[in-house]
A protein has these predicted regions:
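Conserved class I S-adenosyl-L-methionine
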Residues: 1-58
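Conserved SAM-binding strand-loop segment of SAM-dependent methyltransferases
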Residues: 93-106
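A short, conserved alpha-helix within the catalytic core of class I
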Residues: 127-136
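Conserved beta-strand signature within the Rossmann-like core of class I S-adenosyl-L-methionine
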Residues: 143-150
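A short acidic, Gly/Pro-enriched loop at the edge of an enzyme's catalytic core
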Residues: 109-120
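Conserved SAM/SAH-binding beta-strand->alpha-helix loop
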Residues: 79-81
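Conserved SAM-binding loop
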Residues: 86-87
């Protein structure tokens, strides 16, 4: 792994967040969308557990949940503190998981610490538009991309990011997923303003 000065700053910023709020519900309780995506799309397509990639997985709340369903999960995050918490939170499941500290702003599916594509690639509340094609490349033919993050409407709500660079415009996620077959898409504003997607990479 290698870090630029900017990614070092990002790593330190997230390290501080994880260390200050270790064990907080924010880092340990999975977003309900994962369970819905699993029962509605992942399980029907893959009744036998496969391999999954969790990008910007932090302390492992989504990776660990999927590992509990029998899946082999690789988690990548820029924060070594977050990844170490994920390893600890996983407990015995850690033996069936892979933990990678790396700068995702330069993520290349062909250069990571794995050799095959994944049945499921997921990312929650992480937006790096430039690597979206690499995320899609990491999905094996017939596999799924499961994605959820904030939209521009979040700027007017409490919490979450306010920088437009970290917020999706209306319909933007569908554009980013162009070329995939969309199975589920929803934009909504409740306590958070989010867009969520399940899309399949055709064979």
């Amino acid at each position: 792994m290698s870090f630029t000065s900017s990614s070092n700053n990002e790593r330190e910023r997230w390290n501080q967040k994880y260390l200050e709020a270790a064990g907080a519900e924010t880092w340990t309780v999975p977003d309900p969308f994962l369970a819905r995506a699993f029962s509605g799309y992942i399980l029907p397509l893959f009744p036998h557990p496969g391999s999954a990639l969790d990008l910007a997985g932090g302390a492992g709340r989504h990776a660990i949940w999927l590992a509990k369903q029998g899946w082999e999960v690789t988690l990548i995050d820029v924060s070594d503190a977050g990844v170490e918490q994920a390893r600890q939170n996983a407990g015995p499941l850690a033996s069936h998981m892979h933990f990678v500290v790396d700068d995702l702003t330069h993520f290349k599916a062909s250069q990571t610490e794995f050799e095959t594509a994944f049945e499921v690639v997921m990312a929650f509340f992480y937006l790096e538009r430039e690597i979206f094609p690499e995320m899609v490349q990491a999905v094996r033919p017939g596999g799924l991309l499961v994605y959820k993050t904030y939209t521009l409407a979040q700027a007017k709500l409490a919490g979450g990011p306010k920088n437009p660079a970290h917020l999706l415009a209306p319909g933007e996620l569908l554009q980013l997923a162009d070329g995939l077959r969309v199975l589920h898409y929803c934009e909504e504003v409740t306590e958070k303003a989010t867009a969520e997607l399940v899309a399949r990479k055709e064979k």
